[in-house]
Design a protein with these regions (language model features):
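Hydrophobic alpha-helical transmembrane segments in multi-pass membrane proteins
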Residues: 11, 40-44, 55, 228-405, ...
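Divalent metal-coordination and catalytic microenvironments
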Residues: 98, 145, 215, 243, ...
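Non-globular, low-confidence helical/coil segments that flank catalytic cores
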Residues: 32, 128-144, 171, 181-185, ...
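N-terminal leader/targeting segments
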Residues: 1-87, 163-165, 291, 486-491, ...
Length: 690
C-alpha cells in the first residue's frame, strides 16, 4: 500500500505519534533517555543512508524526524511527567488552594490545584462538595483535604481526587470576572456554550432531547446507561460521538446551500470554516471533533495553495497537533479510535469502492436496483474496514467486538444521513410557532425509529463476540503484524490488503466453532463483600448463579466477571430472591443482555412484592422468566444441571459432581476445573448420577 511513500510529513507525524505513545510508558528521566536514544538512532541511520545511497533529501527528513522525537520527549516531560511528580508527591492530608475550571455537574467540579500547603503547583483534579452546587468558573476555594490519586481511568489528565477533611473550613472567593483568555477559560466558555445550546435542545425536542444532544453537540450526559449499552453492543456508538461523519454531513449540507445560491468558492470556505469552529466549541472541543475540523482546515488550505490535498497527511498532522498541544490526549481511547477508523476509510476502503462499477442498465428498475446493491456493498465495506482497523483497541481495551455492527450500520446509514441535518434544522426553527411543529415531529419519529433499530440489534443473540479467548489473542496479534506490514510495503495488487481480513474471519470462525463444540463446562466462583457468585461457562454460553442471602447488591461483581468470561448472560439464577436481587438485576440488565431469569416458586405471601419487582424488571428488559420447584433440578447448559434444596446447592456434570452444605463456605467443581475456597474443616462428598 506504501502508506508513507512520498508523504514525508505523514512519516514525520507517524514517528511523532509513535514516540508519544512509547514515551508514556516511561518515567520523566526515562523519556529523556529514550528520546535521546531515538534521535541518535535516526542520525546513525541517516549517515549510513547518505553514504550508501547519496540521497540529498535524507538529511532534511532525518532532521525532521529527530525534531519530532525531541519535541515530543520535551513536551511529554514538561506537561506529563512534571505534573505527575507534583501530583503524587502531594498525596496525603493538607491545605489546598484550588480554582474551578469547569462545573461539570451538581456538586462535582473540575478544578486546578494552585497550592498544596506552602508549595505552588498546577495540577488538574476533580472535586466533590456535598451541598455546594453554585460554584462558577474562576471561583477559588481554600480547605483542608485528603488528597489521593484519581480513580477515573478514562481521563488521566485528572491526576488527583480531593475529599474534604473538614467541611467547616471551606473558604470560597467568588471570581470578580471570568478570564477566558487561557486554555482553561476557553474550555470553560465552550462548556457554557454547550450547556446553553443543550438547554435550547431540551425545550425543542422534549423527551427525545438526550439523543438529539448526542447527535448534534456530543452532549451524552442525559443518555441513560441502557441506551448507551445498546449503542455499544450494536456497534453504533460513533453516532453519538461528534466526528468526521457529523462534520461531513452538517458542513456538506451547508456547502450545498451555499452552492445553490452561487456563493464563490473562497467565501464558501471562509463561511464553512467559521461555522465549523463554532460547532467545535459547541461540542466542547471533543478530540474526535477537533481532529475532523483540523482535517477540514488542512484540506481547505491545500485547495487554496495547491488546488489539491492529501487526506492521509492531513489526518496524521491533525492528530499530531492535538497531541502536541494536549499531551494527555495520548491517553484518550476515543481519539485513537476515531483516528484508526478514519485511516482505514482513507487508505483501504478506496481500493474496494474504486473497483465497484456504476450500474448503467437500460431498464430503469434494474439500474436502480443495482445501484442500491452497490450502495449496500459500499456501506458494509465501510463498517468492515473501520472495525478491522479498530480491532487492536477492541481486543485490548474492551475484549469483544460487535458483529451486529454490520447489518445495523447498513440499516441506520440512510436514516442518520437524513436525521443529522434534520435535527440541526429543527434546533434552529423548532421554537418558531407552527413552522417548527412538522420539523420536531419528523425528527422525533426518526429518533424513535433509530432507537428501535439500535435496541433490536443490541439484543441479537451472539451479536457481540468475545475476544478474551487465548486463540483470539494469537489471531489478533498475527493479524496486526501482517496487516501493518502490508500497509507500508509496495503491493503488486493493492487488493491483497483484504487477504488478512478474510483469513482472520475464516480462522476465527473455525476456531470459535471448534472451541464451542469441544470446550468442557467450567465453574468459576467469584467472591466479593462476603458473597459468592458462580459463573457457569460452557463454550460461548454463560450462566450466572446468585447463591447467597447477602444484603449487598452484586451488580458490579457480576459485570466485572462478565468482562472476563462472556458478553451476555443466558440464564441468571436467583436462589434467594430479595430486594438486593432486584437492584442487582436492574444494574446487570442496564449494562448487558440477560436472556432468562430463573427463580424458585414463592411459598409465602411476604415474597410477593419482591417477585412482582423481579417480574416488572424482566418485562421492562424483555427477559423470560422461569420458575422452578425446590428439590428439582434446572438445566443450566447442555452438560450442567443445578439443583436447589433447603440444605444445599448441587452442581451436576456428565461424570461427577460435588456438594457443599449451605452452612459452610462453598466448593464448586466440574471435572478438572474447580474453584475452591480453602477451609480446613470442609467436608464434601461425591454424588452418584442417575
Amino acid at each position: 500500500m506504501e502508506l508513507f511513500r512520498r508523504r514525508y510529513l505523514c512519516l514525520v507525524s507517524f514517528v511523532f505519534l509513535l514516540s508519544a505513545f512509547l514515551l508514556t510508558l516511561f518515567s520523566g528521566v526515562g523519556k529523556i533517555i529514550i528520546g535521546a536514544a531515538a534521535i541518535v538512532g535516526v542520525i546513525i541511520s541517516a549517515v549510513f543512508t547518505i553514504i550508501l545511497k547519496k540521497e540529498k533529501f535524507i538529511p532534511f527528513l532525518c532532521g525532521a524526524l529527530c525534531f519530532a522525537v525531541a519535541v515530543n520527549a520535551f513536551s511529554s516531560f514538561v506537561f506529563i511527567s512534571i505534573p505527575d511528580s507534583q501530583a503524587y508527591s502531594a498525596v496525603g492530608e493538607n491545605t489546598v488552594w484550588v480554582r474551578v475550571i469547569n462545573p461539570t455537574g451538581e456538586e462535582k467540579y473540575d478544578v486546578r490545584l494552585l497550592r498544596v500547603g506552602d508549595k505552588y503547583v498546577s495540577i488538574k483534579s476533580e472535586l466533590y462538595i456535598d451541598g455546594v452546587n453554585d460554584l462558577e468558573y474562576g471561583d477559588e476555594l481554600v480547605f483542608n483535604a485528603e488528597i489521593d490519586r484519581a480513580m477515573d481511568k478514562s481521563d488521566k489528565s485528572k491526576l488527583l481526587s480531593l475529599t474534604l477533611s473538614d467541611d467547616d473550613r471551606v473558604f470560597i472567593r467568588k471570581a470578580e470576572k471570568k478570564n477566558y483568555f487561557s486554555i482553561d477559560g476557553i474550555l470553560s466558555l465552550s462548556h457554557d456554550m454547550q450547556d446553553a445550546f443543550s438547554d435550547h435542545i431540551d425545550r425543542v425536542f422534549g423527551d427525545h432531547a438526550a439523543i438529539a444532544k448526542g447527535l448534534l453537540v456530543n452532549d451524552t450526559r442525559d443518555i441513560d446507561v441502557r441506551t448507551d449499552t445498546a449503542f455499544k453492543r450494536s456497534g453504533t456508538s460513533h453516532i453519538l460521538a461528534v466526528s468526521g461523519m457529523h462534520i461531513s454531513l452538517l458542513m456538506g449540507a451547508l456547502d450545498l446551500v451555499l452552492r445553490s445560491i452561487r456563493v464563490k468558492k473562497i467565501i464558501r470556505i471562509a463561511i464553512i470554516s467559521i461555522v465549523a469552529l463554532f460547532f467545535l466549541a459547541l461540542a466542547a472541543f471533543a478530540a474526535s471533533a477537533v481532529r475532523s475540523v483540523i482535517m477540514l482546515y488542512a484540506v481547505y488550505l491545500c485547495y487554496i495553495l495547491y488546488e489539491e490535498s492529501d487526506s492521509q497527511t492531513s489526518l496524521f498532522i491533525s492528530i499530531s497537533l492535538i497531541v502536541l498541544f494536549s499531551p494527555y490526549s495520548v491517553y484518550d481511547i476515543g481519539m485513537w479510535m476515531s483516528f484508526l477508523a478514519t485511516l482505514g476509510l482513507l487508505v483501504v476502503y478506496p481500493q474496494f469502492s474504486e473497483k465497484m462499477p456504476y450500474p448503467k442498465h437500460k431498464n430503469r428498475f434494474i439500474r436502480y436496483s443495482l445501484r442500491v446493491l452497490v450502495w449496500c456493498a459500499k456501506t458494509l465495506m465501510i463498517t468492515v474496514v473501520a472495525n478491522f482497523f479498530l480491532l487492536p483497541i477492541m481486543w485490548y481495551f474492551f475484549g469483544s467486538i460487535s458483529i451486529s455492527a454490520l447489518p445495523c450500520n447498513l440499516v441506520l446509514s440512510p436514516i442518520v444521513t437524513v436525521l443529522m441535518p434534520l435535527c440541526a434544522i429543527t434546533a434552529i426553527v423548532g421554537v418558531i410557532p407552527y413552522v417548527g411543529i412538522p420539523f420536531v415531529f419528523a425528527s422525533n419519529k426518526l429518533i424513535d425509529l433509530m432507537m428501535a433499530i439500535v435496541n433490536y440489534f443490541a439484543e441479537v443473540r451472539f451479536g457481540v463476540v468475545s475476544l478474551q479467548f487465548e486463540f483470539a489473542s494469537v489471531l489478533v496479534v498475527l493479524f496486526m503484524i501482517v496487516f501493518s506490514v502490508l500497509l507500508v510495503i509496495k503491493l503488486k495488487h493493492k487488493s491483497m490488503i483484504f487477504i488478512p481480513m478474510g483469513a482472520f474471519v475464516l480462522t476465527f470462525a473455525l476456531c470459535l466453532a471448534v472451541f464451542s463444540a469441544t470446550a468442557k463446562p467450567e465453574l468459576k466462583c467469584v467472591r466479593a463483600r462476603g458473597a459468592s457468585t458462580v459463573f457457569v461457562l460452557n463454550g460461548t454460553e454463560c450462566s450466572v448463579i446468585d447463591i447467597d442471602e447477602n444484603n449487598h447488591s452484586k451488580g458490579i461483581t457480576i459485570l466485572n466477571g462478565m468482562s472476563k468470561y462472556a458478553t451476555e448472560i443466558d440464564e441468571y439464577i436467583i436462589v434467594y430472591p430479595s430486594e438486593k436481587d432486584v437492584k442487582t438485576l436492574e444494574t446487570v440488565c442496564k449494562n448487558t443482555v440477560v436472556r432468562k431469569v430463573i427463580i424458585p416458586k414463592f411459598l409465602e405471601n411476604k415474597d410477593l412484592p419482591i417477585y412482582y419487582d423481579i417480574f416488572k424488571c424482566a418485562e421492562k428488559y424483555n427477559i423470560k422468566i422461569e420458575l422452578f420447584d425446590r428439590g428439582s433440578d434446572v438445566v443450566i447448559t447442555e452438560n450442567v444441571r443445578f439443583c436447589y434444596t433447603d440444605e444445599n446447592e448441587i452442581f451436576v456434570g456428565n461424570n461427577n459432581a460435588y456438594l457443599a452444605t449451605k452452612d459452610e463456605e462453598l466448593i464448586y467443581a466440574y471435572g478438572d476445573h474447580s474453584s475452591v475456597i480453602p477451609n480446613e474443616d470442609r467436608t464434601y462428598k461425591k454424588l452418584p448420577l442417575n
